[in-house]
Amino acid sequence: MPVHSREKKENNHDEMEVDYGENEGSTSEEEETESSSVSEEGDSSEMDDEDCERRRMECLDEMSNLEKQFTDLKDQLYKERLSQVDAKLQEVIAGKAPEYLEPLAALQENMQIRTKVAGIYRELCLESVKNKYECEIQASRQHCESEKLLLYDTVQSELEEKIRRLEEDRHSIDITSELWNDELQSRKKRKDPFSPDKKKPVVVSGPYIVYMLQDLDILEDWTTIRKAMATLGPHRVKPEPPVKLEKHLHSARSEEGRLYYDGEWYGRGQTIYIDKKDECPTSAIITTINHDEVWFKRPDGSKSKLYISQLQKGKYSIKHNHN
């Protein structure tokens, strides 16, 4: 071991010093007496061997002592390090070690920040979902209201159309009933065929038509004709004098609940402009399209109708409102 080599070098150095001192002593003694030097040299050599052996034993003892001290120090250092590690481990287990507390504090701070951010994000998501829900509810309500208004207008227009047709039927029935009553009254007023009075012949001037049908058949035919004219349109119920047919200036017709006018199609619920000659155009919403007429609703809530023949003749014109 290095300790042994060092101790050996020290022993050799001490021996050299001893030898050097002894040599000086011997030279001085040689100068004093030459006779006594020979005897003393023999004695000094015997002392040197004993001295070396004694010093060697001392060095060995000292080396063993040093090795023992080194081993004791090493064991003591190991025990101290072990006790320090055990103490640090106990601090970590107890949660008091600085090496554990500092990262733990950083982790807790990071956890608090992320928890706060997650809470804010959750609130924003809930608010977004709530806004979407309210928007959908509002859109559904608006759609329902618009559909209700449209359905109300449609039902109202259909009911008005039915009422109009019923009124026409009532008028036609009144006419036929009057004719029927007149016929009954005329029958009651007839005289007895066995009476001597004869009916005076009717004098007719000019060409005339002789009807071979009975009065009841004529009344039935008249009622059927009136009903057929009522279904064609209100403007054809009343008999009109024959007029000269006018040439249609515009193309207008009704097909499957839609209106075709001058190359464009119009449907129920669309907003249009109605233009009449010498008048300002007005805005309206189409509510019903029949075979020969169009019902529309004005902004003030009033309803009116427009005959397709009026569009064909150019009395009225319509166009889309794109606003």
Swiss-Prot record:
Stretches with biased composition (Acidic residues): 16-51
Keyword rRNA-binding attributed: no
A single MF term (Gene Ontology): histone deacetylase binding
Source superkingdom: Eukaryota
Location in the cell: Nucleus
Record field: compositional bias (Basic and acidic residues): 1-15
Keyword list, A-Z: Coiled coil, Nucleus, Repressor, Transcription, Transcription regulation
BP term (GO), one: negative regulation of transcription by RNA polymerase II
Region Disordered: start-end pairs: 1-56
InterPro entries: Sds3
Entry coiled-coil feature ranges: 50-82, 147-178
GO CC annotations, alphabetized: Sin3-type complex
Function: Involved in the histone deacetylase (HDAC1)-dependent transcriptional repression activity.
Family per record: Belongs to the BRMS1 family.
Protein name: Breast cancer metastasis-suppressor 1-like protein
